[in-house]
Amino acid sequence: MDSLPRLTSVLTLLFSGLWHLGLTATNYNCDDPLASLLSPMAFSSSSDLTGTHSPAQLNWRVGTGGWSPADSNAQQWLQMDLGNRVEITAVATQGRYGSSDWVTSYSLMFSDTGRNWKQYKQEDSIWTFAGNMNADSVVHHKLLHSVRARFVRFVPLEWNPSGKIGMRVEVYGCSYKSDVADFDGRSSLLYRFNQKLMSTLKDVISLKFKSMQGDGVLFHGEGQRGDHITLELQKGRLALHLNLGDSKARLSSSLPSATLGSLLDDQHWHSVLIERVGKQVNFTVDKHTQHFRTKGETDALDIDYELSFGGIPVPGKPGTFLKKNFHGCIENLYYNGVNIIDLAKRRKHQIYTGNVTFSCSEPQIVPITFVNSSGSYLLLPGTPQIDGLSVSFQFRTWNKDGLLLSTELSEGSGTLLLSLEGGILRLVIQKMTERVAEILTGSNLNDGLWHSVSINARRNRITLTLDDEAAPPAPDSTWVQIYSGNSYYFGGCPDNLTDSQCLNPIKAFQGCMRLIFIDNQPKDLISVQQGSLGNFSDLHIDLCSIKDRCLPNYCEHGGSCSQSWTTFYCNCSDTSYTGATCHNSIYEQSCEVYRHQGNTAGFFYIDSDGSGPLGPLQVYCNITEDKIWTSVQHNNTELTRVRGANPEKPYAMALDYGGSMEQLEAVIDGSEHCEQEVAYHCRRSRLLNTPDGTPFTWWIGRSNERHPYWGGSPPGVQQCECGLDESCLDIQHFCNCDADKDEWTNDTGFLSFKDHLPVTQIVITDTDRSNSEAAWRIGPLRCYGDRRFWNAVSFYTEASYLHFPTFHAEFSADISFFFKTTALSGVFLENLGIKDFIRLEISSPSEITFAIDVGNGPVELVVQSPSLLNDNQWHYVRAERNLKETSLQVDNLPRSTRETSEEGHFRLQLNSQLFVGGTSSRQKGFLGCIRSLHLNGQKMDLEERAKVTSGVRPGCPGHCSSYGSICHNGGKCVEKHNGYLCDCTNSPYEGPFCKKEVSAVFEAGTSVTYMFQEPYPVTKNISLSSSAIYTDSAPSKENIALSFVTTQAPSLLLFINSSSQDFVVVLLCKNGSLQVRYHLNKEETHVFTIDADNFANRRMHHLKINREGRELTIQMDQQLRLSYNFSPEVEFRVIRSLTLGKVTENLGLDSEVAKANAMGFAGCMSSVQYNHIAPLKAALRHATVAPVTVHGTLTESSCGFMVDSDVNAVTTVHSSSDPFGKTDEREPLTNAVRSDSAVIGGVIAVVIFIIFCIIGIMTRFLYQHKQSHRTSQMKEKEYPENLDSSFRNEIDLQNTVSECKREYFI
């Protein structure tokens, strides 16, 4: 199979070479001077300084010494008639001899007839040639691509400002021979085969054509089995229909196999090459090639009897054709090496000729181009005061709006306006401001095609005809009497025209017109050009310079292209991309980036190559505290049972991951580690059998290769995990299943060799014996570790740099990275070409500069930051250049943008190495760090390159200095080599950014008591020394925070007591007001009541209490409710315990607190924090190791679910950070094979289980209520031995509440 693409490539190169060889002149040294032998009469010009023809050959010194026009302006030109079509390869110019007259820049135009000129272009833009700097030196230009023409025209653009236009010219080339056939739209050529059937496995068809119309068949052939090949013009584009043996695909109903080209009805030559090998086809029109695979059942194209050129004749009906025939000329027509036109000229018996001639007859049609949307117009005279009016012309444009015609009618008839508005043709006759008549017709007339318009008015009837179809008459025009005027303004109005001779309510027309008739008389536009007829401004006469800016389509990633006369637009709405050319992905490149943005676990789309071609892939981002896992699900993650498979009839299952293999490879290659769990459950079903034997089961990986090793084993070793551990059931085998036992067992493990992942298929061959059965499960592809986002290097000498291969980005370039520095300036990166270059640098402490040159001169964009950028913090830079704009973005500052010029060079051509962190001159080097450098979505592996480069170190420390604020709610940022993590030890929250609330539902009897003691970690894997748990048992301040939802009042929320009878209490009074009670230093109890609302109202409330020394503040729901100063030297003595909910000990509570405590707290509480301690989090997460006691039922839940619901009902919300759960059972899951009996049995079991649970809970509740005090004592005795003895004894608080309390109401 691999040999076919190779053969295709070889044949394609061979055929392309032969085609170009056939079309190139036979003289390989095609550089002969062609103008030096011409007579003076072969030269003509727009005007001449002396009024007579002046020979303008190179080095001419006689007479005036060359050509100069009468006036030096942009309308002048010099042309020569070379006598016949020749191949032109170079040009040269001089100034006029002995003068100060020379041209400094010019353009070239070519023509076969001296009419309908074509401008010379390079890079799809009108090319400007550099001219002379004096009168005598010769400036020679080799054409990038040769031109075949008879007439050449030099158009001066700029000249010596101290002189005038002056030229002596030469063109170089050689003779050009070709075979041409002219088709008049009713004729064809038939090439009859020598045998009945022509069957070919490969074809090469080449030709050149010029067409007079937008539709017509160039050639056609078909066979009886449905084979056909047809090339036809459709609305100015070439459509190729090709089918190989598919009888269902008929030409009349099938869509084209490929469509190429645009504006091919411009009466200029266009080249076509069709190369086919089997079903692989290359279709080339001019310089654009489309490769496709054709439909069909075979590789051979079977054509019966003949090929027809110019039309599709109907068998048995001479002169009748199935489709519109071709009208124009075809040149050098070759079919598989056969020169068809040469055979026809020599009247060979294989050719049957219709009304075909062998020279190209072309009508002398003169088009004009309206260039400027504000100043272009054409004024033509008419015959005034005729009863009626007759005007017709053809136009083509890309603009939806524009004035086509304005004329003031005689005899007070009003003004006639014809315009395009929204692509619709609109005819209006108005008197003053009153609209007398209006006709609308057509749609989408800005499609770039030629459209014919005719206006006829006689007496009181107006007829508007568009493309030979008459529009419905105006309903209110029956009484209009029209008399023709004497001036007709086409395209626009003069700027200095102030009267009603020309009205233009919209912008001027930009486009082409031709075949203008007024009063049924054609208008000679060459006379207009010569100044003898009418007037004009900003017109190109004798050429139509329309250009299809959507060919090729520069809208990327499937964006749709539309255009106006001057630019193109991209519609990105149906893509996953954005930007002027749909270049930028709307998705991030990895789960790591989503995590960095503050997202939590969920489904996301990632675009691994950013602006590259791969496209987005849906994944699950499991964003945990330590690793960020990327999971890619496939279509079969359930346990699947297999029976009846054997080597002759194997079982195979392909896995679909919802994306291409390239997308999956990008995810894997961009990760530090990837794995897939594979499980094989077996009963008398062998897996691998022996390391040297043929395996019974294998899997297919990314390269479509078989892999006989199983999970837990390294590649190349035909074993399972138990074989490496020497723990298999049978020591003679290396997998449990290879023991071939008549009972269920399994081999389960992880595949983690990235070059083989993902698993794309599994094949099983040993489940066809008696009692033989297997069940398999392959988990999702899971990866962690972003090798792109944290890939960083440090530059510590100005002369150091990293170099990479040349950055190839001709049409679109985007560069993004992070940097941090303390230097004043330095170059981030630079890439040079011969003239082009691209450079990004920090040019001052507060400025980033992006400079680029694509050949039109440097463009520089600067973003200035209001704050310093050399602050040793990470900053983000993104620079982009495309065919629409150049832009620079720094952090979140306003983007700097510059529109790209529509003309001139547009390819960015670089050829040096890419320098990162410096320049090729080793000057202006960057000092600092660069991270996550991407060019057009591709990661640059900075760290790997830095390992072998002096002056550069891999990695860059100090992420927390920039990203520490991402850790919320008291979380601490911890540095890692490849990033950072948030340590939530001291926070009542959890999650990757300490933003996830830890909350629980309390019942009325629930109590959570935290005993203060030596520092104890409440987060796993955090050492005691690194734990910042509060250690001072005699604090001088309190920072208390909690959130709650309840409907119960009174309620006790929080109780803090000390061994010296000090306490702080937070409770809800009976009326729902919140009360905070402070008793410190044996003072009277301070009671602070906030009764602004009933806080037992099923809504979430947030309380913050802060005391530092004497100053106390209380916030409720983010509003400051109270501020108070205690007496001097107030402090909280040694704290004993903190209780949430009901206080179960006998602590001698005062009456108010006792009332609230009797009710306890029923509701939901979350985010509880006392200084650096999170007691609720400790109870829920680390109850076995933290000094915390729980009485009653405490159920973890989200308080958000309790709002506006029954808070007294205990609701448990189970969540999983990874929806793709794993199963590792010794036997297959019972639901692998579903049955009704299993479902019914399961329901019964669940009901019985629930009943027993209810009985158990009731029994436990009654027991706990009776033994609560005893349990509290026992719990304290279970603390670790290293606790202070003062906390091992039970301490009863004495009732020191004064009879005289201070109470504060807010």
From Swiss-Prot:
Membrane topology: Single-pass type I membrane protein
Major site of localization recorded for this protein: membrane
GO annotations of cellular component type: membrane
Cytoplasmic compartment spans: 1259-1306
CDD domains according to UniProt: EGF_CA, FA58C, LamG
BP GO terms, sorted: cell adhesion
A UniProt-annotated Pfam family: F5_F8_type_C
Source taxon at top rank: Eukaryota
Chain ranges passing through the membrane: 1238-1258
Signal peptide boundaries: 1-24
Cell compartments where the protein resides: Membrane
Alphabetic keyword roster: Cell adhesion, Disulfide bond, EGF-like domain, Glycoprotein, Membrane, Repeat, Signal, Transmembrane, Transmembrane helix
Glycosylation sites: N282, N355, N496, N571, N622
Annotated coiled-coil segments of the chain: none
Membership in a protein family: Belongs to the neurexin family.
Protein name: Contactin-associated protein-like 5
Biological source species: Homo sapiens (Human)
Lineage of source species: Eukaryota, Metazoa, Chordata, Craniata, Vertebrata
